[in-house]
Amino acid sequence: MSNVSEERRKRQQNIKEGLQFIQSPLSYPGTQEQYAVYLRALVRNLFNEGNDVYREHDWNNSISQYTEALNIADYAKSEEILIPKEIIEKLYINRIACYSNMGFHDKVLEDCNIVLSLNASNCKALYRKSKALSDLGRYKKAYDAVAKCSLAVPQDEHVIKLTQELAQKLGFKIRKAYVRAELSLKSVPGDGATKALNHSVEDIEPDLLTPRQEAVPVVSLPAPSFSHEVGSELASVPVMPLTSILPLQVEESALPSAVLANGGKMPFTMPEAFLDDGDMVLGDELDDLLDSAPETNETVMPSALVRGPLQTASVSPSMPFSASLLGTLPIGARYAPPPSFSEFYPPLTSSLEDFCSSLNSFSMSESKRDLSTSTSREGTPLNNSNSSLLLMNGPGSLFASENFLGISSQPRNDFGNFFGSAVTKPSSSVTPRHPLEGTHELRQACQICFVKSGPKLMDFTYHANIDHKCKKDILIGRIKNVEDKSWKKIRPRPTKTNYEGPYYICKDVAAEEECRYSGHCTFAYCQEEIDVWTLERKGAFSREAFFGGNGKINLTVFKLLQEHLGEFIFLCEKCFDHKPRMISKRNKDNSTACSHPVTKHEFEDNKCLVHILRETTVKYSKIRSFHGQCQLDLCRHEVRYGCLREDECFYAHSLVELKVWIMQNETGISHDAIAQESKRYWQNLEANVPGAQVLGNQIMPGFLNMKIKFVCAQCLRNGQVIEPDKNRKYCSAKARHSWTKDRRAMRVMSIERKKWMNIRPLPTKKQMPLQFDLCNHIASGKKCQYVGNCSFAHSPEEREVWTYMKENGIQDMEQFYELWLKSQKNEKSEDIASQSNKENGKQIHMPTDYAEVTVDFHCWMCGKNCNSEKQWQGHISSEKHKEKVFHTEDDQYCWQHRFPTGYFSICDRYMNGTCPEGNSCKFAHGNAELHEWEERRDALKMKLNKARKDHLIGPNDNDFGKYSFLFKDLN
């Protein structure tokens, strides 16, 4: 069943209808005052819908709701209708919260300035502004803003924390705040002061309530007929006090009187304390509420409730059709009157006649069953059959009528909510089979019903009505509401590449050509494939579940390490979070402290789980603890330019972290257990290579017929081939270079060529090619001219090694070497023992053999470790590092136009068709290019801010070549 409550569903419908009306040129049929009520109610509904979406952590949709409400407020102003300034202020505050959660600091500052222009002492705006300025590195301005906020709410923990952080960064002395003594008075439930203390500057503004003065009489129209018998018979229903129907959620709103069918009224009697906030009934408030409720007796409606044919008559004059009544829900649901036309018109005659005629067949046995449930705000069924207080819904807005505005639709009868047996409705709530059900059609097919229909790659036809026994072994799909109605095959997601970025369409397919790697291409062939692959990678879509299996993704640590390689270990979190990042393990001499040579933190109290992947570079991925607020999805900011919220972000910051969260959510495994499993995985790998239990696939028979060895990479650059010393701690040259993974190179010699060749690590490209080819420059006997890491093999030996590693899922050169050693074990057991065991035989152990391997600084952008301040400064000032700050592999796919020149305006000569400079022109050639330049500038600014925050850029370094234009706007 759907989790959306009936109240919220009605509100969404009212929003949709309200937007349709104000976008039309039709004049409003009521007075100006009634039109003002209508627009304010629409703004209120958009605000409350935005709040509900915010609680679901859908920031984008929430922003859309708040922005729509603000736009309508501007529209109302043009109609000489005033939306209260307090509501405008709250809309901006809540939109600011969304922007802050998404890391859009420029948007946060823009909205904060608007709010502060309306109310200079708004604490939430001051706090959000300070936080955004802090994230952008403008600490002095941030401190000035939070100082004003601190004076207003000195006890708010978030304000205190931010104030202290900024004071530390600015070098200010942190003063302990004075706390006044408070009188020990018993607080009254619902007391405003108590309530204020429970709200934080981090919270959004609560839902808007309906003000009492907006219960305006409706437009006078010909009234439909009600039966005398309906009035007289329903009058016999006994009425119970409102407090007997619990639990209730009642808003402080224009509470309508309980209008009975005979026109009488029963006022809503409710303690004022409980009219404050229907969502917060906790502790003592709940106890007081329960104590005030009388015992409920099940009241059975008399069997003679409705009998015989109903004669129509005019409505009793004592039964007012107010805006509050016509929009009223069952009393079990918390509700604000919707901005629907049903508030201003009486029910349509045709709908009431349908209702009255349907009552002929209404029996007592059915009434008790069908009057059983309504839906609360949270979607929980509330039993209302014990209550005899019946409030009637209007038959819906005029947009649902076939006679209004020329819109043809089936007439609705909302009385079916109460008299379910009178109007039979088939249940349309079906549990979605997959998360794309709202936008995509996915089906199972086979080679018989999904057949090739043309010469092109995507030429397939689906025969849905063919009579056959479908194997259902092919997933096909298409996007709804698009012109292209053809079904596309959705291939299995490529899993051999450890790729975290967005998927892209194959260039050959996009150019309407045949794919060179047809069927094996790791690029997508259609948008449907991209959408399914993206969800599959996140773990949100399971083909097994869609094809009828149990749908569980049984992740284990072994499976994660097979897919992502590397290992899980514990590092010191304080060192890891330091700016710039430092890498410290547990100290071998003192197990209670970290291995940092200067600041030794308590390791157990500050340890964090980290996934380490050593390839051509070293990549550390922090695995944060999983909790209820974590979202099982990748953070789009982290993928693009680095998330400024860091550990406060609820989204996963790497694919391996996402997989760990999914595993923890399913199994509850702890970080300690993950680290132990990782250690056991590598122990098994060393003890039983090529064990199928560990690698998941048997090593290809007939290992490469080559000799393999490691040499010192630093010496190799100077033309020297130097192997390690017998302890494998340093190279055997006089320089004594450290023998670590990132400082050694592999060389192989084939039996045929009898020549040692250098082997580079396997390319870490997003899309691994089907086969590796020789570099054209090398094949022609020239030197490779490619700037960077050429992904083509530079020798036949390198091509063989890469192909073997790709086909066997081996990413690490060290792992490849270990496998080769194992394959040679039977022939050269003595040599292997001396090479694989680092401390075999009687050796003299020097103190330096056990020296702690520490990394003073680590650049996560380049994957480079630096062991001194001088080396670090040299690295962050290098051109290669600066290019890494701004450049990503996805840039060639994301952008279509030239790189921004720094002049963000359109070329007048180009618009006149006379620009002679072409691509050399410093101005934008068209709106599309200008828009992309502005978007690209914003993305580059975010990357720059992230790099500055992590101290990956020198504080006074403004020399960034073509990127220097970014510094004009930052200071």
Curated annotation (Swiss-Prot):
Gene Ontology CC entries for this record: nucleus
Coiled coil: 924-952
Source species: Homo sapiens (Human)
UniProt cross-references to Pfam families, sorted A to Z: zf-CCCH (PF00642)
Gene Ontology MF terms in the entry: miRNA binding; RNA binding; zinc ion binding
Gene name in the database record: ZC3H7A
PTM annotation (Phosphothreonine): residues: T210
Source taxonomy: Eukaryota, Metazoa, Chordata, Craniata, Vertebrata
SUPFAM superfamilies: beta-beta-alpha zinc fingers (SSF57667), CCCH zinc finger (SSF90229), TPR-like (SSF48452)
Span of zinc fingers (C2H2-type): 857-881
GO biological process, one term: post-transcriptional regulation of gene expression
Record's function text: May be a specific regulator of miRNA biogenesis. Binds to microRNAs MIR7-1, MIR16-2 and MIR29A hairpins recognizing the 3'-ATA(A/T)-5' motif in the apical loop.
Disulfide pattern: none
Protein name: Zinc finger CCCH domain-containing protein 7A
